[in-house]
């Protein structure tokens, strides 16, 4: 009988497919965020995760790029698309901050400072660890911020504007594919990094998965109420 730890013949194929699915999922997510931001005249990703994400893509796409043939082009494509997301956010975020005039008047400055601060954070992690380790921990930080930030943005707005089921699923499934890829590499000894055997890593994964699942539940609840309200309005 084949030992359970022996790498299957299809290992590389599965890992590459999962990596590609993750990259495509996030590309689709950025495209949809830009579309819904312009359609609904709002921003789809909350401000701090947006700053952290684009800073991560800038650092690991330009300042400290991966030597892997596929990884760098994917990150650069994310960076280009995310610039459109940031542009839409700066253009339409004042619509969401009428209750806070000080923030509303200085949103471009706040985005600039936020991106600069997050860039410094990612660089500091590289200086503390090696680039590959910092790459993973920075990505985990971005993922946790994005998932929790998205959930609380949805709760605060009490509205599904700027979002959709496809937008949510592209992010969620893209991230899940990335986790499955890393889990396979860890299981078969192809990764030198701690994964599910590390408590902090396992906690971060659990935290963003729970947050993203709750996002789907809350989105469904809000969308159902919106559709019911629209139906009543038509009936009147």
Swiss-Prot record:
One of its GO terms (cellular component) is membrane. This is Terpene cyclase andB. Terpene cyclase; part of the gene cluster that mediates the biosynthesis of anditomin, a fungal meroterpenoid. The first step of the pathway is the synthesis of 3,5-dimethylorsellinic acid (DMOA) by the polyketide synthase andM. DMOA is then converted to the phthalide compound 5,7-dihydroxy-4,6-dimethylphthalide (DHDMP) by the cytochrome P450 monooxygenase andK, which is further prenylated by the prenyltransferase andD to yield farnesyl-DHDMP. Further epoxidation by the FAD-dependent monooxygenase andE leads to epoxyfarnesyl-DHDMP. It comes from the Eukaryota. The keyword Nucleotide-binding does not apply. Pfam families: Pyr4-TMTC. One of its GO terms (molecular function) is lyase activity. It is found in: Membrane. The gene is andB. Pathway: Secondary metabolite biosynthesis; terpenoid biosynthesis. Its EC number is 4.2.3.-. Belongs to the paxB family. It is a multi-pass membrane protein. One of its GO terms (biological process) is terpenoid biosynthetic process. Keywords: Lyase, Membrane, Transmembrane, Transmembrane helix. The chain crosses the membrane at residues 13-33, 45-65, 70-90, 106-126, 135-155, 166-186, 200-220. It is an enzyme of class 4 (lyase).
